[in-house]
Amino acid sequence: MLMAFVLVISSTRWGLGQDQQRSFPSDNLASAVLIEDSEGSGSGFFFSYHDAVYLVSARHVLFKPKHLPAGGLSADFEPIAHELTLTSYSQDPSDTSANVFKIDLDAVVQTAVAKYHRSQDVAIVKVAQLVPYSDEERKQNLTIGPTALKAVGVPGVTLQKASRKGLLGVSAENTKRLSETLIGNDIVVMGYPSSIGLADLKQIDYARPLVRRGALAGTNAANKSLVLDCQVFFGNSGGPVFEIDHQGLGYSFNLIGVVSQYVPFANTAGSQTVGVQILTNSGYAIAVPTDFIYELIDR
């Protein structure tokens, strides 16, 4: 099945004279993908690597632990729902048309198109294979560039609607591994925090991703994770984390991880002996580094 969309790779570098009013490239505003199923919603993003396009998200957004017949939970996981709906936008914030995919999660798991990491909170689904256009196709459409690729669908993934200006994806060239990240650098988190606000007040357009700024607070060598000084909420899980680096007179903007969870702050109401422990959002969060995205794809 030919999927009629154009993959647009987000910018990674900009400097003086380039969109000076923004602190990061404007075409990254729509990097996040809204993931909806019968259980709720989460975030993700499209990632281009090895001539394929993948949906990347947190494992717990796409899978849940299997229940054992005798009770308890297995170390294995199963799809969180039978069907997913993905919604994303092009690199142009003024383009209101959306890309909408339907994914048969049972089917893509059976064909190994979907994979999850056993020890890290990350999962992937291949949504398309990228192949060159034929000479005949190029003759019929002179707007096709010499390096342009077309997207060929995979079983279980259906493109229901395509935006006018293409699908925004992150390229493998625009990433940093855990060992390359710089503690203290600014970061940007994007996603769909559906748990914030009151729907009746209509303060937030839940159909569009929100941007949150913060800093890379540290890394956890034992867990191989990133610690973010950036508050996240339910719905942010699976969204991309970008690091901003200073490079001469300009900056670079690279994917460093996937939002996994917030770090709770534990407080005790009442006495220390009989009090009730109350957990609140500390403002810190944990992200899975890009190393494990590559590990899943190459597995």
Briefly describe each language-model feature range.
Residues 53, 121-123, 226:
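Short beta-strand micro-motifs in enzyme catalytic cores
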Residues 98-166:
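Hydrophobic alpha-helical segments and helix pairs
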